[in-house]
């Protein structure tokens, strides 16, 4: 009898456990956000935690986590729950898929709602203790906008719209329109720091905003961005196709490199598109993106192709040019105003050569001070025609370890191989977009970096859209310049921790070269220190270089300004 009783007790416990799982569903991780008392920093931390949670077990490309593909994720780890609470205490819980950051369902007030194309995995494991309802539309933007009878550009975002959206979803009202609010303020903001920054500003100022053309084009092209980044490979900036964004005025902007894409969008996380080729420095050559944006090569290695062609922008915004357009062996390379002429068009091949007019960029010797010329690819020494182009903006001859350098900032300056001191005179960008990006630089407490004249420090002030002192020109030589006086550069006054950052005349120095890291830091490559609001105290009016900590006083976002 004891054996039978024990068996019955075991059966009861097992059934109870099974029933409990059936009622409760899987205990998925949860990342919550409460509007009541929320500040900009609260929202920042919420998105940071959400990114970390969905990125568990991922690898990185250019410092950005690549979300896992469906085949790599067990059901018990497939979703993250995101409870959102409004000012009245109503809570709606979103279910977010860790493979793509999509909102796949939500619950509130003992009800749950699934899109009409919901999978059995979603319905069997999410909100199973609620009354499950199926919506008449899917979760893509076209369907949501049709169901809402409005477009995203007409829907306000910010604390008040989020408050109203939570109320509506809690009661099952205006579902499509409300989802358009929460999806952009949660999923899209997790994908793009630009969108995060827009929401943070609205929280700080208690205002609302509508998405602009640039923001909407980001949302529509996350998949193609992810593909271009993964196909280029780790530690590589140039893309092999382009990402088509829109400017604020709805004109097209074709982005062809990671550095520019990051400065414009602040992309923070990648959709898995294909397995990147293993590489550190070498440029890889993939196929152009074809088909609609949401189709991807799940599980396939990125396909390679032979070449792509770009300008090379360097010191003072001048381009690498074959002198006088001559294709004679030994013709030197020089700086010259950027254009579309064939002697400024450089083809990057999969054999690590860089070619113009059918000839190879060639080191005329492998010693410090050797000049760089074009030469017949078949007869030049092989170690003189090989180049690496890492993401930091150097162009390196790997045999010598020397880098391409522009010793003067003037047209007709002959380019040389020199020791790599991470100078601005050694910074380059491979792109067809030869003009500098003009942007504000937003940092600690949503304040803007401000210039205060030559030989003076920079510091933080409240952002003002019309302030010329807060407008910066981001050059291809990796300098940050005062937009109204482009001969002045952001400069670290030394390379030691706590050295001040000031404004000096641009001289191509290592102290004037900066790298916008994908973790939000702005790095001086020479010192390896980052731009830092001293002691997290804006009233000190001191910006310094300091070892990287990842703290908020070292986090920066560029906000591109209308041209």
From Swiss-Prot:
Glycans are attached at residues 221, 368, 376, 483, 537. The keyword Disulfide bond applies. This is Nigrin b. Residues 305-431, 434-559 form the Ricin B-type lectin domain. Keywords: Disulfide bond, Glycoprotein, Hydrolase, Lectin, Plant defense, Protein synthesis inhibitor, Repeat, Signal, Toxin. 2-alpha repeats lie at residues 445-482. The active site is at residue 188. 2-gamma repeats lie at residues 527-554.
């Amino acid at each position: 009898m004891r054996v039978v009783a024990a068996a019955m007790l075991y059966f009861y416990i097992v059934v109870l456990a099974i029933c409990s799982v059936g009622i409760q569903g899987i205990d998925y991780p949860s990342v919550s956000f409460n509007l009541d008392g929320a500040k900009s920093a609260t929202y920042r931390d919420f998105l940071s935690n959400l990114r970390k949670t969905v990125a568990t077990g991922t690898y990185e490309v250019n410092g950005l986590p690549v979300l896992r593909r469906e085949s790599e994720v067990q059901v018990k780890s497939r979703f993250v729950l995101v409870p959102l609470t409004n000012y009245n205490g109503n809570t709606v819980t979103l279910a977010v898929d860790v493979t793509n950051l999509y909102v796949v369902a939500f619950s509130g007030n003992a009800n749950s709602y699934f899109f009409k194309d919901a999978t059995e995995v979603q319905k069997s494991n999410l909100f199973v203790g609620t009354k499950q309802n199926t919506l008449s539309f899917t979760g893509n933007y076209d369907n949501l906008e049709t169901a809402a009878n409005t477009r995203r550009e007409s829907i306000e975002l910010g604390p008040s719209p989020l408050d109203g959206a939570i109320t509506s979803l809690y009661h099952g009202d205006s579902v499509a329109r409300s989802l358009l609010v929460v999806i952009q303020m949660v999923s899209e903001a997790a994908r793009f720091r630009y969108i995060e920054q827009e929401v943070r500003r609205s929280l700080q100022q208690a205002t609302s905003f509508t998405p602009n053309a640039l923001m909407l084009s980001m949302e529509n092209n996350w998949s193609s961005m992810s593909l271009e980044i993964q196909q280029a490979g780790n530690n590589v900036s140039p893309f092999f196709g382009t990402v088509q964004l829109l400017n604020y005025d709805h004109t097209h902007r074709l982005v062809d490199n990671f550095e520019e894409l990051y400065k414009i969008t602040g992309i923070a996380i990648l959709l898995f598109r294909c397995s990147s080729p293993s590489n550190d420095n070498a440029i890889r050559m993939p196929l152009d993106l074809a088909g609609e944006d949401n189709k991807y090569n799940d599980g396939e290695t990125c396909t390679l192709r032979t070449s792509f062609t770009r300008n090379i922008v360097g010191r003072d915004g001048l381009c690498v040019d074959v002198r006088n357009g001559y294709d004679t062996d030994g013709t030197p390379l020089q700086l010259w105003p950027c254009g579309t002429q064939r002697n400024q068009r450089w083809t990057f091949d999969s054999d690590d050569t860089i070619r113009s007019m059918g000839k190879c960029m060639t080191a005329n010797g492998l010693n410090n001070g050797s000049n760089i010329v074009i030469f017949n690819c078949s007869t030049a020494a092989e170690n003189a025609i090989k180049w690496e182009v890492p993401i930091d903006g150097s162009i390196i001859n790997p045999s010598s370890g020397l880098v391409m350098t522009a010793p003067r900032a003037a047209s007709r300056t002959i380019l040389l191989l020199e020791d790599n001191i991470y100078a601005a005179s050694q910074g380059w960008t491979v792109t067809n977009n030869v003009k500098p990006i003009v942007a504000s630089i937003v940092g600690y407490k949503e304040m803007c970096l401000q210039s205060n004249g030559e030989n003076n420090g920079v510091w933080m002030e409240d952002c003002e859209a019309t302030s010329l002192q807060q407008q910066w020109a981001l050059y291809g030589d990796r300098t940050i310049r005062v937009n109204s006086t482009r001969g002045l550069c952001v400069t670290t006054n030394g390379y030691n921790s706590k050295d001040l950052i000031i404004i000096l005349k641009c001289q191509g120095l290592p102290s004037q070269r900066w790298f916008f890291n994908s973790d939000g830091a702005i790095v001086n490559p020479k010192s390896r220190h980052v731009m830092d609001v001293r002691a997290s105290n804006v009233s000190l009016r001191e910006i310094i270089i300091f070892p990287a900590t990842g703290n908020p006083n070292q986090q920066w976002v560029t906000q591109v300004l209308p041209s």
